[in-house]
Amino acid sequence: MLITNAELVDGRVVDLRVAGERIDAVAADLDRAADAASAADPDSDDETVVDADGNLLLPGAIDAHVHFREPGFSHKETWETGTRSAAAGGVTTVIDMPNTSPPTATGDAFDAKAAAAEAACIDYGLNGGVTGDWDPDSLFDRPLCALGEVFLADSTGDMGVAPDDFEAAVDRAVAEDVTVTVHAEDETLFDESARDGDAGGCGRDANADLWSAYRTADAEAAAVEYATEVGRETSADIHIAHTSTPEGIAAAVDGGATCEVCPHHLYL
């Protein structure tokens, strides 16, 4: 395939040739001898030519934090609907989080999710989770992308773990050379007074303002500092999920961790 007149992110307008599944060449004016043959007979074996007409050409995006909710909550989303939506938005690889039902915290649960993921139309990976009764022996026998989110406070799926369990999980991940993705909130710093507000306070029916008031910025920053401290002490590869405050990002950077941010945390 030859893609012509495509704009790259640096402003250059180029042609790009794809051979099989790899980019073969990028240049200002690649050979367009196949244009006429392709136009005359689109079903021929000759090279297909696509005129990008000056539109941006980007590589497929990788979304390393998705919740496709299958198995267990397929009324919300499935691997088919989630990956079709991702593909429509230019996302070609996704990594799914473990707070499904059952949680992806055992080898059998991983296998069940892997079976559901066969409906995916793009590339994917699966993370493993930590619960009070997880089975690390069977879980780490599977091809995990990472361990986590490991929840330092309860959230969707009620998979919050105590500090001792978190530290034990990090130790095991280090032994297995697996990255630990952390949902970083210190629930001792949640603002209990927000529970007295309208619209449910902090539960599933809460409005956005009260939810944010309850799960405070200080709770995130403190948990990031704790997680990165554990990471430094164990030489773990720590990744902080969905940082939502400048303080949380600063704590991740200062602590030697990587972190991610959601578009709605930037723009809403």
Label every PLM stretch briefly.
Residues I95-D96, G125-N127, A236-H242:
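Short catalytic-loop micro-motif centered on adjacent basic/acidic residues
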Residues A6, E21, G54, H65, ...:
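Divalent metal-coordination and catalytic microenvironments
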